[in-house]
Amino acid sequence: GDALKKRVEPLAAELGAHVVGHCDVTDPESMDAVFAELEKIWGKIDFLVHAIAFSDKDQLTGRFINTTRENFSRTMEISVFSLAALSRRAEMIMNDGGSILTLTYYGAEKVMPHYNVMGVAKAALEATVRYLAVDMGSRGIRVNAISAGPIKTLAASGIGDFRYILKWNEYNAPLKRTVTTDEVGQSALYLLSDMSSAVTGEVHHVDSGYHTIGMKAVDAPDISVIKD
């Protein structure tokens, strides 16, 4: 959509990327066309970054049990099946020893308010990572996921009480802060490069250690009385 286009084009220009295209992951022909074009331009690829998810934001609030069949199916198709579909196509033009990386969230492991079906989808995504890692391992192709802490992004804007979530993580994570996009990017670079040549099927947390916490930290303030 236009909202993403306005962000992608400047980023592509900054990085000197000459190939920017449209891909509809619900349309097999669209995905086929993208990889045919990449093969035509580059011949081979070294990695694939899967950073796509979708759900009706109106169904991320309230009770998960009220998720509609239509939204559940669409969420799973776009957020989960797309990784398998894109990986299958990428494998055909990927060099041996390549890397595939996707993005997940702690809501796959524990119930998070206002995440609902996306939490279920992310759990399925993490399972998909493990199965793909086995499928593609014989060629040395690695498949991993980054589970980042909350960051102010376009996707995060659809999550209710996001500012509260940011503050909660800041006060309760072992490092007493949230994470930055640069820190997530550095972890992605590690997982996409030969520095992680023996790492596959993993969910790598970049969340200031928040995933280790079981309850409110002893020294954390009462967030209900904290003003921004």
Each language-model region and where it sits:
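C-terminal helical subdomain
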Residues: 81, 145, 163-199, 204-208
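N-terminal Rossmann-like NAD(P) cofactor-binding module of classical short-chain dehydrogenase/reductase
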Residues: 49, 101, 205
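Short C-terminal tail/terminal secondary-structure segment
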Residues: 189, 200-228
